Amino acid sequence: MTNIRKTHPLMKIVNNAFIDLPTPSNISSWWNFGSLLGICLILQILTGLFLAMHYTSDTTTAFSSVTHICRDVNYGWIIRYMHANGASMFFICLFMHVGRGLYYGSYTFLETWNIGVILLLTTMATAFMGYVLPWGQMSFWGATVITNLLSAIPYIGTNLVEWIWGGFSVDKATLTRFFAFHFILPFIIMALAMVHLLFLHETGSNNPTGIPSDTDKIPFHPYYTIKDILGAMLLILTLMLLVLFTPDLLGDPDNYTPANPLNTPPHIKPEWYFLFAYAILRSIPNKLGGVLALVLSILILALVPFLHTSKQRSMMFRPISQCLFWILVADLLTLTWIGGQPVEHPYIIIGQLASIMYFLIILVLMPVASTIENNLLKW
């Protein structure tokens, strides 16, 4: 009798994706982040569901409903902080996952990569709207500042902003619709993740060398299931250390003050995982220019496959590109730091230089370095 795992219509799909999947034998721990992102997503949906049972999306009661969750609901505090810090873990895994793709040339799987870029944008939108829901000072002013950026769009900008707000300012209508979108988007992310996986399994995984590994494949289970379980345990350990010891480490103290439209906080800034993009936005003195740079800072990822000039796929044997890659990582860390600083000297000029470097490395230096490395191969 054939194994039910291989014949049952539903179990067959699971089997081909997680059990009998032929996987390169040499993929490193950098390949763990895909499964970790799946775990993060499930964790966020579950904690979010329980939070939604007690949350009210009304401007008068939103803040106190979050307080009620933390004080009166059984284990409400841990659910709330797991959700808030789970978002941070989600973005850490996302950045690692994208970084891995850039380093090892995984972007040559065009469909998988493009859906990944869409996933990144959708996740950023979801996280932004989630940050608005507690209706603290930073929630309100963050929503006001970021949605206001759309007014930079010529001709339709103002109408667009008022349409998104559902009025002439961020108010009850805005909060209600943000809650609705924040609830539905994770399920869209889940569907997109399935398509992401579907396209990946059409080609099979990349590996650190960037060389086709069809001659050396091993089954996903038990080799990589056990490796993923180790990664998952480390992820959950890190998350619980954050939640139980320093739950507010990555948050903003201003968000413990209820939203007040009459009082602007001295420094409006988003969560840490948006600071690099926020720094790029602020580094351009022109409003429309800043918005374009902000959008391009993420969409530039979709251009990366077309800027690949190297004869090799991975950066494993390309020292100049490796050097540039780590400079890019340092540059992004610099931008993240600058995004959290006030707009004054010397932070302004550092932010501008780091923003120029970001686009310069990806658009100019990387392709040039690849061409130089191609020529060095002839020696």
UniProtKB/Swiss-Prot annotation:
SS bonds (residue pairs): none
Binding-site residues, heme b b566: 97, 196
Cofactor detail note: Binds 2 heme b groups non-covalently.
Binding positions (a ubiquinone): 201
Co-factor(s): heme b
Positions that bind heme b b562: 83, 182
GO cellular component, one term: mitochondrial inner membrane
Superkingdom as given in the UniProt entry: Eukaryota
Membrane-topology annotation of the record: Multi-pass membrane protein
Primary subcellular site in the record, as a coarse category: mitochondrion
Keywords, alphabetical: Electron transport, Heme, Iron, Membrane, Metal-binding, Mitochondrion, Mitochondrion inner membrane, Respiratory chain, Transmembrane, Transmembrane helix, Transport, Ubiquinone
Compartments, record wording: Mitochondrion inner membrane
GO biological processes: mitochondrial electron transport, ubiquinol to cytochrome c
Alphabetized Gene3D superfamilies for the sequence: Cytochrome Bc1 Complex, Chain C
Gene Ontology MF terms: metal ion binding; ubiquinol-cytochrome-c reductase activity
Pfam families: Cytochrom_B_C, Cytochrome_B
TM region positions: 33-53, 77-98, 113-133, 178-198, 226-246, 288-308, 320-340, 347-367
Oligomeric form and interacting partners: The cytochrome bc1 complex contains 11 subunits: 3 respiratory subunits (MT-CYB, CYC1 and UQCRFS1), 2 core proteins (UQCRC1 and UQCRC2) and 6 low-molecular weight proteins (UQCRH/QCR6, UQCRB/QCR7, UQCRQ/QCR8, UQCR10/QCR9, UQCR11/QCR10 and a cleavage product of UQCRFS1). This cytochrome bc1 complex then forms a dimer.
Family statement: Belongs to the cytochrome b family.
PANTHER family reported for this sequence: CYTOCHROME B
Other noteworthy facts: Heme 1 (or BL or b562) is low-potential and absorbs at about 562 nm, and heme 2 (or BH or b566) is high-potential and absorbs at about 566 nm.
Function according to Swiss-Prot or TrEMBL: Component of the ubiquinol-cytochrome c reductase complex (complex III or cytochrome b-c1 complex) that is part of the mitochondrial respiratory chain. The b-c1 complex mediates electron transfer from ubiquinol to cytochrome c. Contributes to the generation of a proton gradient across the mitochondrial membrane that is then used for ATP synthesis.
Designated name of the protein: Cytochrome b
Organism: Capricornis sumatraensis
